[in-house]
Amino acid sequence: MAVTYEKTFEIEIINELSASVYNRVLNYVLNHELNKNDSQLLEVNLLNQLKLAKRVNLFDYSLEELQAVHEYWRSMNRYSKQVLNKEKVA
């Protein structure tokens, strides 16, 4: 599969966004001293899901698939902000 400028640009944007989302959740887990092995905690499950999602090789995807991956990370960005902000309010 050929790598184009558009595809490389999309991958770079996804990498930046995914790192931001993952680091937000990781910082929350670490700052609140949550047990990273406790699968009963929503934040820990979210962290593990994001870790798995970050491991995919984006260069194997088509541009259309990358756009879907980008939307996934946008959704996870919004969701993680909602979940972590609710914890602060509660």
Swiss-Prot record:
The root-end lineage is: Bacteria, Bacillati, Bacillota, Bacilli, Lactobacillales
Per UniProt, which keywords does this protein have?
Plasmid, Toxin-antitoxin system
- State the source organism's domain of life: Bacteria
Query: What does the function comment of this entry state?
Result: Antitoxin component of a type II toxin-antitoxin (TA) system. Neutralizes the toxic effect of cognate zeta toxin. Part of a postsegregational killing (PSK) system involved in the killing of plasmid-free cells. Continuous synthesis of the epsilon antitoxin is required to counteract the zeta toxin.
> What InterPro entries does UniProt report for this protein, alphabetically?
Antitoxin_epsilon/PezA_dom_sf, Epsilon_PezA_dom
For biological process, the GO terms are: negative regulation of cell killing; response to toxic substance
What is this protein identified as?
A: Antitoxin epsilon
Instruction: State whether it acts alone or in a complex, and with which partners, per the record.
Output: In the presence of the zeta toxin, forms an inactive PezA(2)PezT(2) heterotetramer. The heterotetramer is still able to bind the zeta toxin substrate UNAG.
Q: Which residues form the signal peptide?
A: none
GO molecular function term, any single one: toxic substance binding
Q: State the remark under miscellaneous.
A: Has a short half-life in vivo.
